[in-house]
Structure formats: structure tokens, C-alpha cells
Amino acid sequence: MLDIRRIKENPEEIKRLLRAKEVDCDEAVDRILELDQKRRELIASTEAKKAEQNKVSKQIPLLKKQGQDVAPIFQQMTELKNQIAENDSALTEVEAEYRTWMLSLPNLPDPDLKAGGKENNEPLRYYGEPHKFDFEPKHHVDLCTDLGLIDYERGTKLAGTGFWIYTGLGARLEWALLNYFMDCHLADGYEMVILPHMLEYKCGETAGQFPKFADEVYKIANPTDDRIHFMLPTAETALASIHRDEILKQSDLPHKMFAYTPCFRREAGSHRADERGMVRGHQFNKIEMFQVTLPEKSDEAFEELVTKAENLVKGLGFHFRTVKLAAGDCSASMARTYDIEIQIPSMNGYKEVSSVSNARDYQARRGNIRFRREETGKIEFVHTLNGSGLATSRIFPAMVEQNQRADGSIVVPEVLRKYLGGLEVIERK
């Protein structure tokens, strides 16, 4: 949620920045200003009527003492009471509409981002060299099927298209990846949390994913409960709400966390031919990094998260590039995003394996997450940041394809071998 004071100070600048995100919010900004003015007028009117009501009520004892008729005074007080009730009712409606419009606005992009969509994304740096083969490489679907690592057919039988089963060494390899990621985060002093996989609507609203993207998650029907629940699409959705409606101590910041969760996405729409297999599924495993920071420390925290994601990818031996997203390619909640992208041999170009983002105070305002500054005692909004650290749905197929040998076996990355009892090569039995 944006700061209403900033909107009022320069509404045209707000409109311009949001257009850089390829979003037309002119109507929303204008309506918010109208509703804010109406809200203030109603509050002022109510306060004036309450003051008048209090003043009139003080006349009653004196008039009674003087033997005068107090019926007109009671009539006046009744009229004031009714007017206050009407104002309160109108204020409730205005504030509800005001909040709806405020929630609809995306975050403002950082001023140094290029306007427009992904065509204006800017590669910042490259690491390593693209992998080259001296034989015709196989697709990860064929490799995993031949080696008994993934069972796509039975996964579809159990849950439909877009699901799979990790089997045997495939399950252990997946778990090795997750353990490698977790050990790295623990070594960096991040707190591990285990989250619910089912969340209430307010979590999606705080993260900035609802109401706009509410149709992209799996909702859960519960005939005995009228609350809206949904399956977790990413741990960020839950982590952003851990401190919702709290005032934190400055000494408790930064709060650095990570969480492993399965992620559930509807992934509506058709997929390209080169996206068969694990690249786009309805359920995948991911470890999410998250920081709650002081406002003046969020740029530093962002660079830390980017470096952490890059180091995880480096550790697995991948060539990658780090890309600064243009304003229109950043998600609605984020002011800034860098993607770490790798090459999957069976696919064209680079594919994102981690997005690291800074929401500034956008999520904090939506979730009322604040801290008390020690020097002044002032209550301020925190900043929140998140980053994939990492998701396996693209790392796994890229790892399998890049590490394949001509005989169809797969070399296990060195950093994963300790989780597999020292296994160096996965071969067909």
C-alpha cells in the first residue's frame, strides 16, 4: 500500500511512476484523492457535531434548575445523534471504498529502473561459461525417466497434468538440493521457520498478491467455515504476515528468515513446447529467503540477498547471469527486482531460478508492520524483502541436463554428494 501523503503531495508523479510499470492507475489515484477528502470532511463534521452535542447537553441541568422547558434541547440532541449516526454510516462506506482503491495500487518502482516490460530488462553481470556438449544431449524428461528419478505418468494419474513423483535417487537428489540450500542459509545466520501450507485471505492481501491475483491460487472449500483459505503459492505470502499488526523493537531488526515449502500454483494458460516436464508445474519445492529491515538498511539487505542467491547457483556449477528487471516486469508488490537466470540445454535462452525483490514499505503498510525507533520513540514502517533461495523446479532439470554424460548417466554436483552418501554418478541400473 502506498503512503497517502505522498499521493496527495504529487499525484501526477505517482501516476507517471505507475505508468512506468505499464499500469494505468490514473482513475484510481483521482478517486483515492476524492475519497480521502470526503473522509476528512465526514470526520470533521462528526467531531463538530459531537462537540455541539456535548455543549448542548451541559445546558440541561441549568435549564431544569431555572424551571425552563428542556424538551427542545432533547429534540436537538436527538437530531445531532441521528446526524452523527448518518455520518458514521457514510464514513464506513467511504473508508471501505477508499481501502479497496488503495489496495488496488501497485508499488512504485525505484526511480533508477527503466520503464516498460521485459524487453527493457538489463543484464548486469555474467558468471562462468555456457555449458557445451560433444554429444547430442537428452531432455530432462527422458533422462529422469530412463534413470528412474521422476515418474511423470503416475504423477498425472494421482493429481492430473502438471504433477510428478520423485522416486528413488530422484527423491534423494531433490532432498539433497533442499538440504544444501538450507545449510547455506543456516550458516549465514538466517532463522529457519516451518509454515502452514494453508493460509487465510489476509496473508495474500498483505503480500500484495490479493485481490488482483486471487484467481491464480488454489482456494479451499470449507462448508463449516466462511473464511477464505488458499494453498500457499510461495512462502513469501506467509512470511510477509508473520509480523502483521505488530510493533517491533529496533533491536530485533533485521529479522532474517528462510522457509522450505511446497508451492501450489494454478499456472493457467498454455505452455510452450520447450516447457514440458518440470519447468512449469502446479506443485514444486522452494526455499524462500525473507528479511524485515530498517528502512535505511533495505538497500544493503537487497544486495545481501542477491549475493546469497548467486552463491547458491555458483555452488552447483552453473553459468548464470543477473538481470535488473525493468519497472513493468517487476511484480505488483515490488519496487525493485533482480533475477538470477541459468540456461537449461533443452530450452532456448535463459530461465529465471531466483527473483530477489525489495518491497520497501509497501507490504508493511498493507500488513501494518512497524517498529519503534530507539532514538526518538517514533513508530515507523519496516521494509520487507524476499528472494528465492532456491526453487528446485528449474534447478533440478538444469542440473540433470547439464551434468549428463554420453552414456546417459548423470554426475552429481560435488556440493550434493555428502547428502547422498558420497554418490558421484547416477547410472542406469
Q: Which residues are covered by each model-predicted region?
A:
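N-terminal alpha-helical targeting/anchoring segments
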Residues: 1-131, 145, 149
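TRNA-recognition modules of translation machinery and tRNA-sensing kinases, especially anticodon-binding
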Residues: 126-429
